[in-house]
Amino acid sequence: MTTTTMTAEPLSTTPRPLTTRIATVVRLLFANPWTAIYTPLLILGVVFLMNLAIWSIVRASIPDDGEMATAVNGGVLFLFIYMLVVAVQSVNQAFPLALGYGSTRRDFVLGFGVFAVILSVGYSAMLVVASLIERATGGWGVGHSFFTTDELWQAEWWEGFALSLLAFLLFFSIGAATASVYVRWKAMGMYVFWGALVFAGIGGAALVTMLNAWPQVGEFLAWAGVLGAAAWSLIITAVCALAAWLILRRATTSG
């Protein structure tokens, strides 16, 4: 009778490359594409078709000799708000899972950043393509403007892309920072956070009013233009992203 001796192989202690760890977090965040992709596109499509149908009915009721201005609809703005919600849900739900699967806090923050950039670029490109079709068809044949505004109607496509990209990144960073506060300090942290935010907003508006600086603010916005003013949002985006990292690096997954 012979016996077989089994020798256990030592476990590899070589750490995974950073890119691999980041990709793992990104795959985790995209695990349910309905949340970040399918649902917002479905809602956007339904809202667009409803607006187009309503505007077509209104236009059909105008006499042939009547005039009708191009309608500008803000329905597409819901997409930016929805991405803020996606950011909040992603951080709240995926952060403890990522740590449970062996990812570090840095891996999660970097992975979330890649996740946000991918969605921001993708949705910005979609809005640009839709706006180009909208222009080419004269507002979908009925003078209806859903994917663009009067300010961007004459702008170059890359300006619309840059503006959308900046807006998406801003909303993602705000959502991540807000969610990180809840992850670390729960309800009490949210009370303090929103209280401080309201206080800062009212205080800032009061300061500008006391200095009679509103005309200067308006002049600056007019001078910078839509895209130039939006570029300043990068400061807020960077601050929120940094805040999310500083908060999450000390956060735990326990209640």
Question: Residues of each region from the PLM?
Answer:
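Selective transmembrane-helix segments that form parts of the transport pathway or gating/packing helices
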Residues: 34-44, 109-132
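Secretory targeting signals
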Residues: 51-73, 116-185
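Alpha-helical transmembrane segments of multipass membrane proteins
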Residues: 43, 47-51, 119-127, 171, ...
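Long, hydrophobic alpha-helical segments
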Residues: 71-91
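Transmembrane alpha-helical segments in integral membrane proteins
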Residues: 86-97, 166-189, 239-250
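Helix-loop-helix units of permease transmembrane domains in multi-pass membrane transporters
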Residues: 91-117
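Hydrophobic alpha-helical transmembrane segments
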Residues: 1-67, 207-255
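Central hydrophobic cores of alpha-helical transmembrane segments
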Residues: 190-200
